[in-house]
Amino acid sequence: MWLPLVLFLAVLLLAVVCKVYLGLFSGKSPNPFSEDVKRPPAPLVTDKEARKKVLKQAFSASRVPEKLDVVVIGSGFGGLAAAAILAKAGKRVLVLEQHTKAGGACHTFGENGLEFDTGIHYIGRMEEGSIGRFILDQITEGQLDWVPMSSPFDIMVLEGPNGRKEYPMYSGEKAYIQGLKEKFPQEEAIIDKYIKLVKVVSNGVAHAILLKFLPLPVIQLLDRCGLLTRFSPFLHASTQSLAEVLQQLGASSELQAVLSYIFPTYGVTPRHSAFSMHALLVNHYLKGAFYPRGGSSEIAFHTIPVIQRAGGAVLTRATVQSVLLDSAGKACGVSVKKGHELVNIYCPVVVSNAGLFNTYEHLLPGNARCLPGVKQQLGMVRPGLGMMSVFICLQGTKEDLHLPSTNYYVYHDTDMDQAMERYVSMPREKAAEHIPLLFIAFPSAKDPTWEDRFPGRSSMIMLIPSAYEWFEEWQAELKGKRGSDYETYKNSFVEASMSVAMKLFPQLEGKVESVTAGSPLTNQFYLAAPRGACYGADHDLGRLHPRVMASLRAQSPIPNLYLTGQDIFTCGLVGALQGALLCSSAILKRNLYSDLKDLGSRIQAQKKKN
């Protein structure tokens, strides 16, 4: 009975895919990846004025290029990458950034004479020959240099009543697995099954990309028939929680906690996160981790010139007030706040990298916010958890202070779900006493150029999950003028987290020069992150469901308005990059994945000839 139906649906799907492929990718736009543009990296530019000319070009009407093809809202990497790809296809693109610096979560800032990252702490799969490295090289012309971090790249620390346990995550699949087995010799078979499942699931991520291109009625039909999850391990794992999968594998509670340690990188605890998301991250780091030489601002610094050379620009201090719509309801430009005035900029295509909530709830005119397609997408997602950041300036080099390039995830309970639920539901005055986890890293130890730029000093960063509601009463206050109560409350988290850090790194006692903290309100101000949610829409099971993934695509319900960045795919640099590829493919009506594959094949063939 089922076989004829399955065969019919398979034939129908094949016909639809062919028709969609011919329709979606029928454009005559130039191929942005027609040739290999990678060249040897130029020397690191440290001159402040030279960097300022690229990263801090303030908005004025006179700096807006003429005859624009595209305006991009937001200069996070999802916006910059989309703009650069479109520029490589001959488009004149203007990127508008509300902050004083371009880069979004890739920007850096100065504090007490040192430099701090705001969002890029480590990236996986950046070795030569990897797909991610290849794509970034083609976007930045090979100017980003990636430095391998030491092994182990991560250490999970479990602070318990019986003392401290450490679980290192080593670089390389064999070493990674062996490290786990040394800690859990009785569960070797479970670890093998887990790694095998991680690889099978993550290798099917192309199915998530395909969902973004197929017509929604086809997706809905396949979903109702159960075929989406039946034939795709990735889509099936998108309906299973991480906790559910680990329990099915028979892992002990301690092993479950260790295998789940990396969940803060996507912000959702094991019972509520999709195993597909987790598998992507674990597989992403199986070969080790990397850090951009010169710091995370190098990412924007080497992407922006590609946009400029095509006649475009990246302008800061440019707060977009609204997306302009014509009489037919199509996007036709943006309105930018300049002082007390509004400057209207018109163009045929608008791309938003501001995220679903900012775009649909704040940038669209009131009548457009009520459109069924807009309301439907907003109803599918919710903002993720907020985050506090603590930035510490240290006296001494990494050698003096014995600082590792390793990241530390510090936990106090193996039941991560219960600990987090208890924490975020607490009265705010008690929360700092029960911080369930800390992320601790030393960016200065990851960057080989650091000592030349900041001799004799080091940097440390800590990340703390935080509920926006705890800080909500100060949201209307101006930055820097939120009063002593705000600073006192913020410092309660700083003191609690520093106490944990000093026990883990006692050699830092007496070496701390200064400590600065940013709350979810800080993320909201500098990154325009609603409710301080630095990962955008929550990466829970609802968000990762195949039906929702298919709905959150580059084409918005507003004609000529496209979306890019992490809300279109997943969080992180590579997730934002995928969002940019999906967005650019839709605008250019080209299969950029196919273009990249063809270029890669030609490069490999040329290497064999040589």
UniProtKB/Swiss-Prot annotation:
In the Enzyme Commission scheme, what number(s) does this protein have?
A: 1.3.99.23
**So which domain of life are we looking at?**
Eukaryota
Does the keyword Membrane feature in the UniProt annotation?
A: yes
Q: Which reaction(s) are listed as its catalytic activity?
A: all-trans-13,14-dihydroretinol + A = all-trans-retinol + AH2
Where does it reside?
Answer: Endoplasmic reticulum membrane
Keywords from UniProt, A to Z, are: Endoplasmic reticulum, FAD, Flavoprotein, Lipid metabolism, Membrane, NAD, NADP, Oxidoreductase, Signal
GO (cellular component) term, any one: nuclear membrane
Q: Which InterPro entries match?
A: FAD/NAD-bd_sf (IPR036188), Retinol_saturase (IPR052206)
Bilayer topology reads: Peripheral membrane protein
Does NADP show up as a keyword for this record? yes
Tell me which cofactor or cofactors this protein depends on: NAD(+); NADP(+); FAD
User: Where does the record locate the signal sequence feature?
Assistant: 1-18
Biological processes, Gene Ontology terms: retinol metabolic process
Job description of the protein: Catalyzes the saturation of all-trans-retinol to all-trans-13,14-dihydroretinol. Does not exhibit any activity toward all-trans-retinoic acid, nor 9-cis, 11-cis or 13-cis-retinol isomers. May play a role in the metabolism of vitamin A. Independently of retinol conversion, may regulate liver metabolism upstream of MLXIPL/ChREBP. May play a role in adipocyte differentiation.
Q: Could you say which protein family the record assigns here?
A: Belongs to the carotenoid/retinoid oxidoreductase family. CrtISO subfamily.
Can you say what this protein is called?
Answer: All-trans-retinol 13,14-reductase
Lineage per the UniProt record = Eukaryota, Metazoa, Chordata, Craniata, Vertebrata
